[in-house]
Structure formats: structure tokens, C-alpha cells
């Protein structure tokens, strides 16, 4: 998977954390059997920036931990007829994730686990949203959260 990571925070994340998130999302992509030509972006921001995005796109005037903007919503697809070999070469853009590093630190402290664990949790949570998972209904929540746990545990990021 082609993963572009941008760090727009005032205190840049350590390379070790950036690499951990990159490796974790690559692991998650393999767990979901995504094709290698899948692409997405992840941008780390501070609370003021994620608050702006949350207000602009969700009409919620407060900072949040993670925002996911899927490139395509389920059912948006218009069928295109093309040669299967050509279709396999066209990149599949999942969309864009934004994670507030301020919220990562706050929530890790509140929940009593490491910053790496919270960072990984939010990255996988947003990644699953980009792949069509949600937690609006109890059955969907159970399915998404089970997969989230399996990915985090399989990667070795336990509580």
C-alpha cells in the first residue's frame, strides 16, 4: 500500500512513531487483503487544526481524535468496463486520515496506556472507516471493533 504521511504538528513526531504507524497500517492492509496499488494519506495535526476540519466538514465545533475522509462512499461507484489487467494497475485511493496528536496524548493518559498504543488504535480505527467499516449499528460496531482488536493484537500493540 502506498501510504503518504504528513506531520503538520508543532512538535514533530519521532521517526520511530512514524515508522510504527506506517508498519501497522501496512500490516492492517495485508490483514484486509488490500491490493498493493491501494493508496491513502495520513496527516498528523494539533487540536486547533482538527477542530477547524471537524467544524468545516462535520459541523462539530470541537477538536476530535481522528477524522477519516473516504475517497468513495459505499454505493458511489459507477461501473467502468475495462480490461482486468488494466484495472489491476489503477491505484485505489482509500482517502485521507487526520489524527490529532494532542488528543492522542490526552487519551493515552486518561486511558492509562502508551502513546504508541493510542496512536496505533486511532490509525487503525480511521483506516477501517476508510475501508467502509462503521459503528453506527451494534452489529457493525461489534464487527469493526473485533477486527480492530485483532489487527492491534496481531501487530503486538496490546493494552
Swiss-Prot record:
GO biological processes: rRNA processing
Entry EC number(s): 3.1.-.-
Protein name (Swiss-Prot/TrEMBL): Endoribonuclease YbeY
Organism: Limosilactobacillus reuteri (strain DSM 20016) (Lactobacillus reuteri)
Keyword presence, Zinc: yes
Chief subcellular location: cytoplasm
Cofactor: Zn(2+)
Keywords: Cytoplasm, Endonuclease, Hydrolase, Metal-binding, Nuclease, Ribosome biogenesis, rRNA processing, Zinc
Class of enzymatic activity (EC top level): hydrolase
Organism placement in taxonomy: Bacteria, Bacillati, Bacillota, Bacilli, Lactobacillales
GO CC list: cytoplasm
Matching SUPFAM superfamilies: Metalloproteases ('zincins'), catalytic domain (SSF55486)
Function noted in UniProt: Single strand-specific metallo-endoribonuclease involved in late-stage 70S ribosome quality control and in maturation of the 3' terminus of the 16S rRNA.
Localization, UniProt: Cytoplasm
Cofactor comment: Binds 1 zinc ion.
Cited Pfam families: YbeY
Binding site for Zn(2+): 125, 129, 135
A GO term, aspect molecular function: zinc ion binding
Family that this chain belongs to: Belongs to the endoribonuclease YbeY family.
